Amino acid sequence: RIFAELYEVKDVSGQVEKYLKMLGLWDRRSDTTSTFSKGMKQKLAIARALLHEPRLLFLDEPTSGLDPEASHLVREFISELKREGRTIFLCTHNLDEADRLCDRVGVFKTRLLVLDSPAALRKSVFGRKVVFHLAEAKDCMVDGLLQLPFVQEAKRVDNKLIIQLDDPDKNNPEIVRYLVDAGVDVQFIGELRYSLEEVYLQLVKVA
């Protein structure tokens, strides 16, 4: 309530109730914060920051110290705030969290290295690589694939061929045709997805 008055919130009781309920703290509203766990204090800080309905919000490690259930609640809450059209700056070392929540990700190492969507960062750092799951893969297939003009890289891992293409959407059918004509049983095709952590490590490595 003190912070609500500092922010000159008109409906103090209504706003306090709204955000305490949304963050699962309403039943503890009469308790002193000294009895709160670290996670509860974290949620209380978020509720306090939202009392005056800011359109721009800075959150520093909002799920730090929270158990999995509370972390999920906070992430869902942040997603709801985003759907309401609020701009949120999220500072986090949890790259999986950043990948789930953020439209754009900035990577810093003494300076801003890059700022883009997670998907664009993956593409710019690693390109788009397609995984062809085969009944049986052989090293000789790689040599043949590398002769194709639209194949940038190719390697075999067990019974999988991992291929980097100029344009997967266009080239995938051509690869399938090539493999089928060679008598290869193609069982499944999927795109290799790198984690945001792998992207981050590669970016800071070459910075």
Language model: regions and residue ranges:
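Conserved ABC ATPase "signature" region
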Residues: R1-R28
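Helix N-cap at the start of a conserved alpha-helix in ABC-type nucleotide-binding domains
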Residues: P68-A70
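Catalytic Walker B motif of ABC-type/P-loop ATPase nucleotide-binding domains
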Residues: L57-D60
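Conserved ABC ATPase signature
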Residues: T32-F36
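Hydrophobic anchor residue at the start of the ABC signature
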Residues: I46
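Conserved catalytic motifs of ABC-family nucleotide-binding domains
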Residues: E53
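ABC transporter nucleotide-binding domain
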Residues: R75-D166
